[in-house]
Each structure stands twice: as structure tokens, then as C-alpha cells.
Amino acid sequence: MLQVYLVRHGETQWNAERRIQGQSDSPLTAKGEQQAMQVATRAKELGITHIISSDLGRTRRTAEIIAQACGCDIIFDSRLRELNMGVLEKRHIDSLTEEEENWRRQLVNGTVDGRIPEGESMQELSDRVNAALESCRDLPQGSRPLLVSHGIALGCLVSTILGLPAWAARRLRLRNCSISRVDYQESLWLASGWVVETAGDISHLDAPALDELQR
């Protein structure tokens, strides 16, 4: 059985400021650095053999902290990037016009083929993050990889493993530096292939950050 751990990056400056990040970037806050160190301590106990990370700055930094604790090299994979949020990237959420807010809401309310202008659809996101996960099956026998990615990207990945369409209403909360695990297995009582073992575990964090849309 292949076990793959999924970690969302630590809290960033734009998370704290309620700005839309997408594939734009901002650095980890002091709290985000602390979260990354806490998840690294947890990861060290899991026997991680490979760290595969989105190549955006916030995931790079989170992955670096985890890699140092685990003694692993990092493989960067652009397929693990966050959803491209087009013309709304870098914008403060409270500054959006009614039309712009409607574009944003399409990504979370189950709108088929919803997308922000110049951005990605949830199906496009799903195709690439699932392809990145499938690549883990090519690792040597006995590998235990950890993927560092983003909130919407990982939420979409876990939801599609559960059989939901990529564009389904977003109902899975994955906080900064939460840990999820998915397994590839053959089972008598589960569908063959990928299954979700756990999602959004934050028991290793002292004080989880609020999601940027809850502030």
C-alpha cells in the first residue's frame, strides 16, 4: 500500500491580509514559519522518504523546513500549484465589485466550468493535481512521499478522490499546515485505487490560523 501525505503551506502575509493569492505569492508570516516547524516535527515521525512541492514561494519555504527535519531532498512540481485565479490575484477580498465577487464565488459554490477571467477552471486544476499524485506510484517500492501544496488544490484533490466532480461545492476545510493522507491500495471493502485515510488533521498545531475567508 502506498501512503501519500498532503500538507498545505504555512500561513502567509496575504492570508493574514485577506488577499487573493492563486499563483501569485507572498512570504510566510512568523506564525506560518512556526506552523511549518510544527508540521515538520510531525512529519519526522512518519518515515517520509520524498518531499514533492509546488514551486511557488510559500510552498517552497514550507517544504524546506519539512525537508530539513526529515533529511529529504525536495522535488518541485508545478502541477501542485494553487488554482490560477486570473485577474483577481493580489486583490483584497473586501475590494471586489459585485461582478468580481460572483466570479470568485463560482469556484466554491458548485458552478460547472466556473472560472475567473484569465484563470483556471476547477477541472483544469483537478487534472494537473491528480496527475501529480499519480506520479507518486512510479516511486520505488516502500516510498512514503509528502506533497506540499495549497488549500484549493488539495481540497480539490481530496474531493475528487472521494468521487465528487472537480467543480463540486467546496465543503472541505484544509487549514494552513494541516496534514491529510491518501492511500493507493486494493481492498475487499473499498474501491480499488486511491482512498482518503484522513483529511485536515491539525492536532500538531498550537493555534491553527483562521482561513483567510473566515477573518
From Swiss-Prot:
UniProt GO MF annotations: phosphatase activity; phosphoglycerate mutase activity
Signal peptide: none
GO cellular component: cytoplasm
Disulfide bond annotation, renumbered to this chain: none
Pathway where this protein functions: Carbohydrate degradation; glycolysis; pyruvate from D-glyceraldehyde 3-phosphate: step 3/5
Keywords, alphabetical: Glycolysis, Isomerase
Record bears the keyword Isomerase: yes
Family the entry assigns: Belongs to the phosphoglycerate mutase family. GpmB subfamily.
The protein's name in its UniProt record: Probable phosphoglycerate mutase GpmB
